[in-house]
Curated annotation (Swiss-Prot):
It is a multi-pass membrane protein. Residues 31-32, 90 are lumenal. It holds the Pfam family Got1. Belongs to the GOT1 family. The gene is Golt1b. Residues 1-9, 54-68, 110-138 are cytoplasmic. Signal peptide: none annotated. InterPro entries: Got1, Vesicle_transpt_Got1/SFT2. It is found in: Golgi apparatus membrane. This is Vesicle transport protein GOT1B. One of its GO terms (cellular component) is cytosol. Keywords: Acetylation, Golgi apparatus, Membrane, Protein transport, Transmembrane, Transmembrane helix, Transport.
Length: 138
């Protein structure tokens, strides 16, 4: 089992609550207060889990400037009160930022008994194969 420090445990909790508030905010027709809270908790939790310096290094790498701009710009747009437009920017930036992790995530989910069989359904399989293929070396 992986050993986590207390700071990392707090970060996991903040990230989990952030994802919950983002999901709940989208279910409730893009409620701007819930989305704003979710954004702040998610970014703060990420900083707690991997550390502040590594978070800055991750977001501000030269080849991720466009992705970071869209993601943080989307967070800002949500915070000023345009949740739908902000979430579109944010989701696009999220996919650009974390696209290197998608093959690993898809490979892991395919090994989970119930979810793996769901990913092999005809309509879903082609989409998952596209998402799960690695275009570049990470």
């Amino acid at each position: 089992m992986i050993s986590l420090t207390d700071t990392q445990k707090i970060g996991m909790g903040l990230t989990g609550f952030g994802v919950f508030f983002l999901f709940f905010g989208m279910i409730l027709f893009f409620d701007k207060a819930l989305l704003a809270i979710g954004n702040v908790l998610f970014v703060a939790g990420l900083a707690f889990v991997i550390g502040l310096e590594r978070t800055f290094r991750f977001f501000f790498q030269r080849h991720k400037v466009k992705a970071t701009g869209f993601f943080l710009g989307g967070v800002f747009v949500v915070l000023i009160g345009w949740p739908l437009i902000g979430m579109i920017f944010e989701i696009y930036g999220f996919f650009l930022l974390f696209r290197g992790f998608f093959p690993v995530v898809v490979g892991f989910i395919r090994r989970v008994p119930v979810l793996g069989s769901l990913l092999n359904l005809p309509g879903i399989r082609s989409f998952v194969d596209k998402v799960g293929e690695s275009n570049n070396m990470v």
